Amino acid sequence: MFAVIETGGKQYLVKEGSIIKVEKLEAEEKKEVEINKVICISNSGLSYSSNATVKAEVLEQCRGEKIIIFKKKRRKNYRRKTGHRQYITVLRINEISLQK
């Protein structure tokens, strides 16, 4: 059984037991979070208003890989190099359920 969930403005295809990295969630490590924005489950096209939920455990709160931003204007000796690391949450999907 698989589900497509939405969190942090992005969509993720998840299965039970899979580990995903999502945008930062306000949850402590080793706690369980419940995601209600389920777009579809298995092969049925269920919408947001369906009674589907996905339960996941927060494995860690960390930062992603560094992204380099480099700006340059040719012939003007203008160069700026900065970096950014986004805060992410690592989740393990425990249960995909559909309440009737």
Swiss-Prot record:
Task: Supply one GO molecular-function term.
Answer: structural constituent of ribosome
- Listed transmembrane segments: none
Q: Name its GO BP terms in alphabetical order.
A: translation
Which top-rank group of organisms is this from?
A: Bacteria
Please report the name of this protein according to its UniProt entry: Large ribosomal subunit protein bL21
Record carries keyword Secreted: no
Family, per the entry? Belongs to the bacterial ribosomal protein bL21 family.
UniProt KW keywords: Ribonucleoprotein, Ribosomal protein, RNA-binding, rRNA-binding
The family database entries (InterPro entries) matched by this protein are listed as: bL21-like, bL21-like_sf, Ribosomal_bL21, Ribosomal_bL21_CS
Instruction: Please describe what this protein does.
Output: This protein binds to 23S rRNA in the presence of protein L20.
Please describe the quaternary structure of this protein.
Part of the 50S ribosomal subunit. Contacts protein L20.
Gene Ontology cellular component? cytoplasm; ribonucleoprotein complex; ribosome
Keyword Ribosomal protein included in the entry's annotation: yes
